[in-house]
Amino acid sequence: MTRGSVFSAAHWAIGGTVVFVVLIVWLLGVNGAREESARTRMAAERGAFAPTDAAEMGRMPNELRESSGLVISRVHPGVFWTHNDSGDEPRLYAIDATARLLATFEVEGAAARDWEAMALGPCPESSDTSCLYVADVGDNGFQRESVAIYIIEEPDPSIGNSTVALLGTVPFTYPDGPHNAEGLAITTGADLVVVTKERDRTTQFFEIPAADVRMAALDGGMQRLVAGRQLPIEPEPSVGRLVTDVALNSDGNVLAVRTYSEIYFFHWPVTERVEQVAEACFLGELEPQGEGIAFRDDGRLVLTSESTPEGAGYLRVVRCPGVGG
C-alpha cells in the first residue's frame, strides 16, 4: 500500500469513526427527547393525581446507596427495615424515621444474589413472633432456574450491629419459566405475593400459600408456583412505568404497587377481576430512582429511593388521593 493509500485509509477510518460517534450522539439525543416528551405529556395528563402532600423524612445513609425493599416494624416503634439491591452482602439495615442508621445485621446462611424486596409478617411456626421475609428474586437476564425468599426472625436494633440466623428458606420456580420480580407482600392469612417487573410483559403476581411457606421453611423443599395473574400495569420504561416494590396496608385489603413514576392501588384479595381502589398516584420526577414502599397505619406511604449522581437517596412520606388518611 502506498503512503497516499495509507493516508487515505487512515483518513477514511477517522472520518468513519467521527460519523459513527455523531450518529450515536444524535440517536441518543432523539431518544432522550422522545422520553422527555413522553414524561412531559404524562405529567400534563396525570398531574391532578399527584400526592396531596409529600415530605422528606431524611437522606439515606452511605451504607444504603441502593436501598430496595422497605417495611415498618410493628414490634419496635419508629424502626424501618431495608436492604440493598444486588452487590451487597446478605445484610439487613434498621433505620429510624429520619433515615439514621440504627444497626446492621448479617444474615447467616443466606445468599444475596439479587435481593429486591421484603415483607413483614408472622413467622411460619409462631404467629406471635414477627419475621422478615426477604426476596432474592431479581433476574434481569431471565437466567435463574429458581429463586428464593429468606425468613429471618425480626431482630432487636437496640442490641447494635450483630449476626442473625436464617430461620427458613422458600425456594421456588415459576410455572412458565424465569421472571424478574421486585415486589413482595404478605397477606393477613400469611400467604406470600410476588410481583414481577419486566419491560416487555404485563405485570403479574404469583401467590405462595401459607401452608407451602411453612412446609418449605421446615425442609427447604422447592415450590413450583401455579400460574400467575395479570395486573393492569403495562410497562413503559420511557415514563418510568416499571414496578419497583409493593405493599399491603395494615387491614390487608389494599395492595399498593409502585413504579418509578406512579403508585397503583388494587383491592385485595383479587377475586374474579382486578379492581383499582383509586386513580394511580402520580409521582412524576419526585423519585427518578424510587424503590421501596410501605404503608403506615394512617394509610400514608413511606418511600425510599436509591442514590443518584446528585447524592444520597431519600426516605419520604406521601399521601395519595383516595387512599388513607
Q: What label would you give each PLM region?
A:
Residues G4-G325:
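Sequence/structural signature of beta-propeller domains
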